[in-house]
Amino acid sequence: MPFRSNNPIMRDELLSRFFPQFHPVTTFNSGLSGGSFLIEHQGQRFVVRQPHDPDAPQSAFLRQYRALSQLPASIAPKPHLYLRDWMVVDYLPGAVKTYLPDTNELAGLLYYLHQQPRFGWRITLLPLLELYWQQSDPARRTVGWLRMLKRLRKAREPRPLRLSPLHMDVHAGNLVHSASGLKLIDWEYAGDGDIALELAAVWVENTEQHRQLVNDYATRAKIYPAQLWRQVRRWFPWLLMLKAGWFEYRWRQTGDQQFIRLADDTWRQLLIKQ
C-alpha cells in the first residue's frame, strides 16, 4: 500500500495511524547501512524501515518498495506500506548466520532471482563512483583514486552477459535461513544488471569459495564456468572502487571510524588486484 505525503511523520504517528494495535518489540541493526525496528500484534510481526542514507533521493527508497512489491514471497519480504521516509515489510522468521550458506544453495537462490521479471531500472556504477568521489572528505581524495576513476570512465562498464534483476548486497547478514529456504533482505541497491555483477559483488570469504559459487551458478545457468568467471573478474575493479568510495562517503557522513578502516582495506585490495 503506497501512501503519498510530502510531510514526513514521526514514528509514533506512523504506528497510531496505520498500525494502532501493534507495538515496538526491538530495534536491530542491519549491516553497515543502518537499522530498523520490529512491531508486533498477536504474533504477527512487521519490520519498519527507514532510508539507510538520509541524503539519498526519495526515489531510491520508492524503488526498493517497488522491487519488493513484484518479487515472490519465497525470496523476499512482502511490503505492506510505503510513505515518505518509512516502509513496512514482513518480518522473515529464521536464522541470520555469520557465514554464507553452501555455494550450491546460494547459487540456486541467485539463479531463481535472476529468472524473475526485470525491475525496470538499470544499475549503473559510474555515476555512483563519481558521486562518492565528490561527496568524500577532500583530505581523503588522492591522485591514485582520481586516476583509477578516470581509467574506469574511459574503459566503460563491461557489456552484460545476461541482464536480470539483481539484489546487489548479498552477504551473510542479508540472508535469512528460513524453514522454507533461503531468503534475502535489505533490497536498497536492487536493480537490473549483469548476472556476473551480482556474482562478483557477493561478500565471499576467499577466492576458492567465490570460484565454487560461480561454477555452481554456471551449471544452473548453462554457461561455461570459465566464461562466467572471466566476466565476474571484469567487474572486480568496478566493485572494489564502489566499495572503497561508499566507505569514504559514509565516513564523511557519519564520522564512524569503522568506515575508514574498511576503506583503507579496500584500497589495499584494489592495488593487489590491478
Swiss-Prot record:
Signal peptide (UniProt feature, chain positions): none
Pathway: Cofactor biosynthesis; thiamine diphosphate biosynthesis; thiamine phosphate from thiamine: step 1/1
Gene Ontology molecular function, alphabetical: ATP binding; thiamine kinase activity
Reaction(s) catalysed by this chain's protein: thiamine + ATP = thiamine phosphate + ADP + H(+)
SUPFAM superfamilies the UniProt entry points to: Protein kinase-like (PK-like)
Residue stretches spanning the membrane: none
EC number in record: 2.7.1.89
InterPro entries: Aminoglycoside_PTrfase, Kinase-like_dom_sf, Thiamine_kinase
Any single GO BP term: thiamine diphosphate biosynthetic process
Disulfide bonding pattern of the chain: none
Function: Catalyzes the ATP-dependent phosphorylation of thiamine to thiamine phosphate. Is involved in thiamine salvage.
HAMAP family per record: Thiamine_kinase
NCBIfam families given in the database record: PRK10271.1, ycfN_thiK
Family according to the record: Belongs to the thiamine kinase family.
Record-given protein name: Thiamine kinase
Organism (species): Escherichia coli O139:H28 (strain E24377A / ETEC)
